Amino acid sequence: HEERVCPRILMKCKKDSDCLAECVCLEHGYCG
């Protein structure tokens, strides 16, 4: 399967659009 492009940077978020590239906002409140 195609890997999502997600830089390994710890970023706080409230929604997916707060995150870089193809990262999504995870339940613990950080992008991943």
Swiss-Prot record:
An example molecular function term from Gene Ontology annotations: serine-type endopeptidase inhibitor activity
Gene Ontology cellular component? extracellular region
Q: Which domain of life is it from?
A: Eukaryota
Disulfide bond annotation, renumbered to this chain: 6-23, 13-25, 19-31
Question: What is one Pfam family matched by this protein?
Answer: Squash
* Sorted UniProt keywords: Disulfide bond, Knottin, Protease inhibitor, Secreted, Serine protease inhibitor
Kindly list the residues the record flags as site (Reactive bond): 8-9
Kindly give the SUPFAM superfamilies that the UniProt entry links to this protein: Plant inhibitors of proteinases and amylases
What's this protein's name?
Trypsin inhibitor 4
